[in-house]
């Protein structure tokens, strides 16, 4: 059984985060039963990002950090975006090599530090799909 836990933020944010992550698992990774996802709602104080996804020890354990100052709509969209990255790691579409700036996307190596963020293929996919899934969250009345 998948484990999804939200920490930080307020109770409403934690409830929304857990429901959206559970929904996204069903949409993107319906056959996965051993995912361990922790959502940390915190002050990111980062001008360039409102969320991050990190694979932990293996491609079943993840930490998602989301800026707790986001409004509900942006919170949902950001979690959908980061869950697309979870899918990419879990399905081994993406693998990054910590500290070297290199990442592999579907077998091809990219230097993430030398490629424009919005031109990275995993980001292109996440941005392309985030609104589709955020709209589904609202349409399906997940929250």
Predicted stretch roles:
Residues 1-57, 72:
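Auxiliary, metal-adjacent structural segments of Zn-dependent hydrolase domains
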Residues 2, 27-34, 93-95, 136-143:
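Surface-exposed helix-capping loop/turn segments at secondary-structure junctions
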Residues 13-17, 76, 118, 122-125:
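Hydrophobic (often cysteine-bearing) scaffold residues that line and stabilize catalytic clefts
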Residues 54-59, 103-105:
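Short alpha-helical hairpin
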Residues 62-79:
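Short pre-active-site segment immediately N-terminal to the catalytic Zn-binding motif
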Residues 73, 89-123:
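Post-HEXXH active-site segment of zinc metalloproteases
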Residues 77-89, 126:
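Active-site recognition of the HExxH zinc-binding catalytic motif
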Residues 116-121, 125-143:
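Long, well-structured alpha-helical subdomains associated
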